[in-house]
Amino acid sequence: MEAPGLAQAAAAESDSRKVAEETPDGAPALCPSPEALSPEPPVYSLQDFDTLATVGTGTFGRVHLVKEKTAKHFFALKVMSIPDVIRLKQEQHVHNEKSVLKEVSHPFLIRLFWTWHDERFLYMLMEYVPGGELFSYLRNRGRFSSTTGLFYSAEIICAIEYLHSKEIVYRDLKPENILLDRDGHIKLTDFGFAKKLVDRTWTLCGTPEYLAPEVIQSKGHGRAVDWWALGILIFEMLSGFPPFFDDNPFGIYQKILAGKIDFPRHLDFHVKDLIKKLLVVDRTRRLGNMKNGANDVKHHRWFRSVDWEAVPQRKLKPPIVPKIAGDGDTSNFETYPENDWDTAAPVPQKDLEIFKNF
């Protein structure tokens, strides 16, 4: 399929959970971050690419695997339907995603190379991460061993710590938004709900099972929500299911606010202690959100075997190495039908004004 077909793609704005939270005193010491400032990004056009496959779908679009025609490099192209973005009032989230990704550079965060829009779609050209979603590996295995969960938790902590150092709250931590690269290291993706913190934010957004109590109660929220979500994620990785679940969101919210956690018997004492301290309803007492910030999490006994200098340098041995046949391999992603997703009507010029700098 030729690149003009790109201009018709619609992007995977992941069905995610969105969360925010509040800020602790004192700047945490960061995981040493091999952050290399990217050179000025190249300028592309849609005609530079061939569309090869759809690797994700979402509320108002798709993510495509594309191949640059000349250099033969592979990228992920996120294509969002402007009419759907406007209808769902997601304009600010789209701008947030672009601004956050332009600001960050970290081994465990997805890279953004180029953005564009026409009269129907918004486009974000990002690195292609061929290992697929952590969610798929968790679903296939049922649950992870303690050492496997420890590895992913350590890399995620370094990513969260880096974002918080830049006053950015991620608000969408979940297995579906964690990709594995060809070596098995993580890449956080989908920054549609990430937000630069000026003060507390009040938006209710996110997947019910991962929402922090302060989000549900509309008390304003900031960094602490990411540490809450980490507690949920660790529980889910090691158990195979989240700690708070119900048939409907209201039931989930009630259980979150009650804060009662039923641990599977196989979890060891230290990880249960860590999860309890991350899932403290009072955010002022939540691990990661107190005076020492992320250091309190990294120094917890469950992480006693982790070399925190080595983590962001990608020196820890990944427990899962994806099976990848080549750079453009899509076998680790779901297969999506190439249906009539590209039927969005052109948007009037006045409605495009909000996207003029995209």
From Swiss-Prot:
Impact upon substituting residue 283 to L: Increases the affinity for PRKAR2A and PRKAR2B
UniProt domain Protein kinase: residue ranges: 49-303
Activity regulation description: Binding of cAMP to the PRKAR1A or PRKAR1B regulatory subunits induces dissociation of the holoenzyme heterotetramer. The released monomeric PRKX is then active and able to phosphorylate its substrates.
Main location group: cytoplasm
Catalyzed chemical reaction(s): L-seryl-[protein] + ATP = O-phospho-L-seryl-[protein] + ADP + H(+); L-threonyl-[protein] + ATP = O-phospho-L-threonyl-[protein] + ADP + H(+)
E.C. designation(s): 2.7.11.1
Top-level class of the enzyme under EC nomenclature: transferase
Phosphothreonine sites (modified residues): 203
One Gene Ontology cellular component: cytosol
UniProt-listed CDD domains: STKc_PRKX_like
Active site, per annotation: 172
Binding site for ATP: 55-63, 78
Region (Disordered): 1-34
Keyword Nucleus: yes
Cysteine pairs bridged by disulfides in the record: none
Keyword Transferase belongs to the record: yes
Induction section of the entry: Up-regulated by phorbol 12-myristate 13-acetate (PMA).
Molecular-function GO terms, alphabetical: ATP binding; cAMP-dependent protein kinase activity; protein serine kinase activity
Subunit relationships: Like other cAMP-dependent protein kinases, the inactive holoenzyme is probably composed of 2 PRKX catalytic subunits and a dimer of regulatory subunits. Interacts (cAMP-dependent) specifically with the regulatory subunits PRKAR1A and PRKAR1B. Compared to other cAMP-dependent serine/threonine protein kinases, does not interact with the 2 other PKA regulatory subunits PRKAR2A and PRKAR2B. Interacts with cAMP-dependent protein kinase inhibitor/PKI proteins; inhibits PRKX. Interacts with GPKOW. Interacts with SMAD6.
Family: Belongs to the protein kinase superfamily. AGC Ser/Thr protein kinase family. cAMP subfamily.
Role summary: Serine/threonine protein kinase regulated by and mediating cAMP signaling in cells. Acts through phosphorylation of downstream targets that may include CREB, SMAD6 and PKD1 and has multiple functions in cellular differentiation and epithelial morphogenesis. Regulates myeloid cell differentiation through SMAD6 phosphorylation. Involved in nephrogenesis by stimulating renal epithelial cell migration and tubulogenesis. Also involved in angiogenesis through stimulation of endothelial cell proliferation, migration and vascular-like structure formation.
Protein name per Swiss-Prot or TrEMBL: cAMP-dependent protein kinase catalytic subunit PRKX
Species classification: Eukaryota, Metazoa, Chordata, Craniata, Vertebrata
